[in-house]
Amino acid sequence: DVVANADGQVVIGEVNQDATAQNIQQRGGGFIDKMIELLQADGKTVAVAGNEFYVNNATGADGTEADADVVIQVAVPAQTTVELCSNEAQAILSKDNCIAIFGSNQTAAEGVLAANANLNVLGSDAANGDVIGVGFDAGSIIKAAVQDGTFLGAVTQSPLMMGYYAIYALTAAANGQELEDVPTDGYWYDST
């Protein structure tokens, strides 16, 4: 376990395309909060640094950037482009103590991969020093990175079911029925 055996502080990065869209806020915040929970269960102190929205909305961080065992470094580019996400990811991946990074949607994940094209630090073997990268979405660039081991894996949604629920909701609304939120599943995939 890279975190358990670390000689000093380690960094886990997260790149979000923005801090305003609710789906990205929830996805990014969910990653941060679950990571804090898991790290603290292993006895680690955690700080969240970077983008103000994500820092202020993180739940349970118990360390400062100066003294935490793990810093979750959250970056949001000035605009939503792969190139600017790549710049943010490069800044995180260039840290000697970066052990993992998450791109929270297709744009951010492709930005992480573009950053890696220059740095060549991502891989699936943390024990040998690879930075573990994961993404969100199933575009061809991300799927290829999962298949070749650059990304350990990624999470995707079910567009078919999202379309189905959209038609269901439209029909219900047209018939005057009250609508409720419909949760949709996410699915992890890797090279296996």
Language-model segments: which ranges?
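A residue-level marker of the well-folded mature domains of exported/periplasmic proteins
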Residues: 1-192
